[in-house]
Amino acid sequence: MSLNKTIYEGKAKAIIETEDSSTVIQHFKDDVTAFNKEKYEIIESKGIINNHISAFIMEKLEKAEISTHFIKTLNEREQLVKKLKIIPLEVVVRNVAAGSFCKRFNIKEGERLASPIIDFFYKNDDLADPMVSENHILYFDWLSSKEMDEVKTTTLKINEILVHLFSNASIYLVDLKLEFGRLINDSTKIVLADEISPDNCRLWDKNTYKKLDKDVFRLNLGDLKEAYLEVAKRLSVKLG
């Protein structure tokens, strides 16, 4: 890890300062957690795999004119990214019923949704990331009405691009979790933050429905590293 000061450390990544006040280093760790940290393990090289997969996807999104915080890959574990003020929301877009969505509505896992569904969650570990409505978001001033429309439009565009990308790799994009932030030097500009990797996407093999994401760890379904390497291989992501 860089010798510079760590200004934030989360469950799977650390954010490290740089000499430029408008950028930070995003460091990918090998830690993997589930059920709000109740389940925890260190899986060798997981951070390396996610770093490369996320960089690959962020570059694809930038080419599709999606604004992201990604600038460049620095090394096997780190990226240079734009410094943001993170909006405290997790934006989940669902294409297939899975996970908490099935429990909430008593729907069978695997049911295809007629169109993508967006859910918002307040990003707060102490409260276990509760689901929130658009009215909550407006009330707490996390987003304006115009910004919310922008985030939803961008989320659906990202989803469309990634559904196609993963489909070409014989993978279903079941759902994904996105985070957004405001540029530190231009608070009117909202961009995609965080990462896009098997840590925050549900990915199923199109033929066997085998899980290729963090559910492998959550549900004790096998070797997480092997699943993540399979995703990288199918996307033709070079790992070094």
Swiss-Prot record:
Enzyme Commission identifier(s): 6.3.2.6
Full protein name: Phosphoribosylaminoimidazole-succinocarboxamide synthase
Keyword ATP-binding: yes
Keywords assigned: ATP-binding, Ligase, Nucleotide-binding, Purine biosynthesis
UniProt record similarity statement: Belongs to the SAICAR synthetase family.
One GO MF term: phosphoribosylaminoimidazolesuccinocarboxamide synthase activity
InterPro entries per UniProt: SAICAR_synt/ADE2_N, SAICAR_synt_PurC, SAICAR_synth, SAICAR_synthetase, SAICAR_synthetase_CS
Pathway listed: Purine metabolism; IMP biosynthesis via de novo pathway; 5-amino-1-(5-phospho-D-ribosyl)imidazole-4-carboxamide from 5-amino-1-(5-phospho-D-ribosyl)imidazole-4-carboxylate: step 1/2
Species this protein is from: Wolbachia sp. subsp. Drosophila simulans (strain wRi)
Chemical reaction(s) catalysed: 5-amino-1-(5-phospho-D-ribosyl)imidazole-4-carboxylate + L-aspartate + ATP = (2S)-2-[5-amino-1-(5-phospho-beta-D-ribosyl)imidazole-4-carboxamido]succinate + ADP + phosphate + 2 H(+)
CDD domains listed in its UniProt record: SAICAR_synt_PurC
Source taxonomy: Bacteria, Pseudomonadati, Pseudomonadota, Alphaproteobacteria, Rickettsiales
